[in-house]
Amino acid sequence: MKYNPNEIDAKWQKNWANNQTFAASNTSIKPKYYILDMFPYPSGAGLHVGHPLGYIASDIVARFKRHKGFNVLHPQGYDSFGLPAEQYAIQTGQHPDKTTKENIARYREQLDKIGFSFDWSREIRTSNANYYKHTQWIFIQLFNSWYNKSNDKAEDITTLISLFQKEGNTNINAVCDDNIAPFSAQDWTGFSSSKQQKILLQYRLTYLAETEVNWCPGLGTVLANDEIINGVSERGGHPVIRKKMTQWSMRISAYAERLLQGLNDIDWSESIKESQRNWIGKSVGAMVSFKVKNQKSQVTSEATLSDLRPSTLDYIEVFTTRPDTIFGVTFMTLAPEHPLVQEITTPEQKAAIEAYIEKTAKRSERERMADVKTISGVFTGAYAEHPFTKEQIPVWIGDYVLAGYGTGAVMAVPCGDERDYAFANFFKGQNGMPEIKNIFDNVDIATEAYGSKDNVIIANSDFLNGLNYKQATKKAIAELETLNQGKGKTNYRLRDAVFSRQRYWGEPFPVYYVNGLPQMIDAKHLPIALPEVEKYLPTEDGLPPLGNSAKWAWNTITNEVDFNENINNTTIYPLELNTMPGWAGSSWYWMRYMDPHNDNEFASPEAIKYWESVDLYIGGSEHATGHLLYARFWNKFLKDKGYAPTEEPFKKLINQGMILGNSAFVYRSEDSKKLYSKGLISDKTTQAIHVDLAIINETTNELDIEAFKKHPLYSDYANAEFILENGKYIVGREVEKMSKSKYNVVNPDDICNEYGADTLRLYEMFLGPLEQSKPWNTAGITGVFGFLKKLWRLYFDDNGLIVTNNEPSKESLKSLHKTIKKVTEDIENFSFNTSVSQFMICVNELGTQNCHERAILEPLAIILSPYAPHIAEELWSQLGNSESISTVAFPICHEKYLVESDKEYPVSFNGKMKFTINLPLDLTPAQIEEIIMKDERTIKQLDGNTPKKVIIIPGKVINLVG
């Protein structure tokens, strides 16, 4: 009876599906274990062998936990909103819903083929209206909340309104917009409804504001920083510029400190935690106000939100972590986008300033942060006044200052900051750049800045002279507060998250507008479903794609979507045209899995209380400052509102490494007329071009030239001259990220079809530690497949089952329990690769021992089951068991079988080992010596001589000294 993986795989995958073997219950007396993978975006390319790596690891843990008696929730779904589907719709005219469903069907087929124990009865899709109605509901809760710093939590907006009615806003301790005008309770009562709404927008956790965004004209939408690479969109490579737009934003900054402190309570890798700490960017210092010398007057409009803020144009507000260095301020730098730039720039400098702003708009914030070598800037012609010395300080703009961090302005102290030092020296001698001031006692700044706070005394600083860092900081803040030109402050780099996207394929906002102000649609009328549109591009007048819909207005009488032509702004109003970003649906999805068929709420309190939070989360580290941060933010908000039981959504996080592809390249000349073989390019200028692996010999790396010429991807080179090595064209090879665009993708279906799903599962784990990246090497697969065939032969010969009920040998029991111990420890420590090695050792040992005993082979099938579930189920069934192997308790290691009763002693003569002998460990040295001296091999070695000394160390060595 031969091992036939294709038959076995299909049989048990069908069995699991029909019996819903892995469906979890929300009411079990078993302890719960919730294990989750970051759900995939269903792209048209399908899965390659790199994608299942994390899923296989999580599946091993899920199956193991079931064996250990846990009620395991291991769900799967699809993050199905997103830009790629929309771009494909634009190109082909197909509705994104259609292509998304097709892609999901393909993903499901591939996932099923690998044999994952997902609870598919809980599948979710973020693009389904019955899912995103709850995303819309959460948005409404955020809109109707404010952050009370006194209670350190989000509260309902009605409590804020009540405080306004009683005492105005002067004593409100809230996270809100800066520089809100003070008002009394009487003022509040006298404000118009629209003005009250505008004020509340400055406190709400989701709000409308004019924001600097990454605008991609080619895609017609705003992009997040992590969607931009080297100044162009990750999707399509389109240029990205910075521009101001009125956008929905999320006040994630309210949770900055809690997000920071929460990292201490979760079991995540230190690298991910550090990424989030840096992104949150806590710094303690002071806010300082510098009076601007030649500002222009500012006219405010009653019709805009800005009428609620007092004029801040008399001062440049600066946050600094080094108020002790305030007497070292040599110049000031504003972000090019700073609102003061246009107000203070002199006519003489206007042209240079505008040219610089235009240039800067083409760079993303991430690029500007990363580029520490390039120095650029322009003098505005304006001056600020030093709060203590009253000296004039020139005001520059520079792209190393970001509008969204701090106040978008810095006080430049070149003697104490390397970047300020480089900037001052670069523009040394130019108009608006004074000499660098040195305020450190006995410190030489002739060649570099002195950035240390330690072991330095302040000098040339009036009342701060002779003080150290801590003393001078405290004194400077006190004096600034006396002048009413500063105060101590804790600042965070974390900025509020832009939540609007100008695209079609995303969650619609449950928002309509009355007199330009946002109104929430009542939750009982959700979902607000995406409308049909004729095209998915922005409208001709620049509105988002939803502007193409003829039916996108809200009727407040019928409480349903109405035709635009019926808008009367008395009962029927325009709906929001933007959609939510790609991260909206993934910011709470783990909670929906707890109760996915609940139509009334995103999950029942009972289900949430039972499952609580995710015990193990597996996914890529690239989400460190995106999804993982937003998910923590939403979870904390839902905790504040009483909907989540814990502060943190994911107790433990593992980031799987990548499986790398082995790419192939041909090398073209500059004129594209010649293609050089790899060994001939060292002295030539060439460009490497990725080659489809299907047209090369994987063993010899030889290119099939005729196939290359006929390949549709390379038709441009059909007439090119191939420069060969020894009559062959040898391609170059390089290990890099596996990607369809690099033509180095290996399809898991191909592996499953040829070797079976269990071979793929074992091989991916065998490649190396889960968290490391490793190259794919097809050559190793046959070894794993051979192991499974060898395992099969322990149970079957050509005639059928050969398992006996005989008593197993001590050696076989030792091999089994050694493996039970090792595999248990490995799974608990997530060291899956070493388990596969142990399985191979065990099967080799059992084969040598000619072991066919049920007492060994039945538990062996169970411990193999998490890794290779199909063959394990088949073996278990063939052994006469009717229930699924997944329901059986995991074997326990009995240490008594691991105790060594014998020892293989090396026997040496004058220190040279000549043979080995197996002896019981309980023998005394005298008994060992007696046995050794009678052994024929000893007699032969001594050749009639008597040893001078016999050295015996029990359990270790025997040495005869002649």
Curated annotation (Swiss-Prot):
GO terms for molecular function: aminoacyl-tRNA deacylase activity; ATP binding; leucine-tRNA ligase activity. Pfam families: Anticodon_1, tRNA-synt_1, tRNA-synt_1_2, tRNA-synt_1g. It comes from the Bacteria. SUPFAM superfamilies: Anticodon-binding domain of a subclass of class I aminoacyl-tRNA synthetases (SSF47323), Nucleotidylyl transferase (SSF52374), ValRS/IleRS/LeuRS editing domain (SSF50677). ATP binds at residue 740. The keyword Protease does not apply. One of its GO terms (biological process) is leucyl-tRNA aminoacylation. It is found in: Cytoplasm. A motif ('HIGH' region) lies at residues 40-51. Its EC number is 6.1.1.4. Keywords: Aminoacyl-tRNA synthetase, ATP-binding, Cytoplasm, Ligase, Nucleotide-binding, Protein biosynthesis. NCBIfam families: leuS_bact. This is Leucine--tRNA ligase. The lineage of its organism: Bacteria, Pseudomonadati, Bacteroidota, Flavobacteriia, Flavobacteriales.
